[in-house]
Amino acid sequence: MRLFAFLWSSVAFLSTVQAQVSQTASQTQDDSSTPTPTPPDKYVNIADALRTKTPMATPNRTIMPTRQDPRAPEPPTPEPTYLPTLSPTPAPTPDPGPWVAKWMDHDQVQPFKQPDPVTVSEKAAVKFKPQIHITNGCHPYPAVTWWGETSGGLKTKGAPSAGCKGSGWGSQVYGRSTWVKGVWAIMYSWYFPKDSPSTGLGHRHDWEHVIVWIDNPDIENPKILAVTPSAHSGYSKQVPPSADCVDGTSVKVKYESKWPINHALESTTEGGETQDLIMWNQLSENALRAMNSVTWGDANCPFCDGNFQAKLDKAWPF
């Protein structure tokens, strides 16, 4: 009986074990066919975070240069492009301010050399340059240098020609011309260091001038229509001039004092001397400023801007 009971218990145990094994295999098969549930959004998927989402870069490939055909001509070298050169902005010209007179000894003033005439007016001025005969008194001297230095003149002492018988540097005649009522007027001016009929009389500095009136400077043979020499703030007039008072195209005047009256110009038959001619527009800038600014005591520069037109109007001979 005991043996039978033992065998029965063994068979029951084996049946139980076999049933459990079968149940486990069936459950395993069901689990493999069911998908793994996705974790909730609140959890981070480490696998996704570690996975690279940027596509892999394609590695650089070195392209071998193409060998140039030796028969092909070389391309022309392009011209270089240069930046334009900018002109510097000129500095504003400073105001020179008022002219300060620079006086020097009358016998140290150097004249301007007579330039070659270029314009019609310059050629006419040279063509009709007058002669001056010094009857008594000073000879003409330069009045201004290139740098604007001006003659200091002479005191009225000694003989009328004392200290002024001529400059070792050479002398000068100053010219300026323009149209006046259809007639071409050429003014020729001389400077004298003093105007003294005798010692103690007269004044330091003197300016005298003659105006030659012609029909037209721009024709082959211009004609002298009149001559007006200056005399004591006025003029003597010859319309037309006497043939004896003209040498070719050069009128003749004399500088003379009839005591006790000061010196003046008048037409003459006597020949005289000539000087280097410098026209107004040929003077240096400093010389122009000096001539327009300097006061000459009792004498007046006739061809400066302040006097030129008024002198022409007063000397009008027609």
From Swiss-Prot:
Family in the record: Belongs to the Necrosis inducing protein (NPP1) family.
The keyword RNA-binding is assigned to this record: no
Cell location: Secreted
Taxonomic lineage of the native organism: Eukaryota, Sar, Stramenopiles, Oomycota, Peronosporales
Glycosylated residue positions: 60
Description of its domains: Key residues/motif important for the effector activities are degenerated in most NLPs, including the nlp24 peptide consisting of the conserved region I (11-aa immunogenic part) and conserved region II (the heptapeptide GHRHDWE motif) that is important for phytotoxic activity.
Keyword Metal-binding carried by entry: no
Chain ranges for the short sequence motif Conserved undecapeptide motif I as given in the UniProt record: 185-195
Organism (species): Phytophthora capsici
Role noted for this protein: Secreted effector that contributes to virulence during infection by P.capsici. Induces distinct chlorosis at 3 days after inoculation of host C.annuum leaves, and all the chlorotic areas gradually turn brown and become moderately necrotic at 7 days after inoculation. Caused only small necrotic areas at 7 days after non-host N.benthamiana leaves infection.
Signal peptide bounds: 1-19
Location of region: Disordered: 24-43, 50-93
GO cellular component terms, semicolon-separated: extracellular region
Entry's induction text: Expression reached the highest levels at 3 days after inoculation of pepper leaves, followed by a gradual decline.
Span(s) of short sequence motif Hepta-peptide GHRHDWE motif II: 202-208
Name of this chain's protein: NLP effector protein 9
One Pfam family named in its UniProt record: NPP1
The organism's place on the tree of life at top rank: Eukaryota
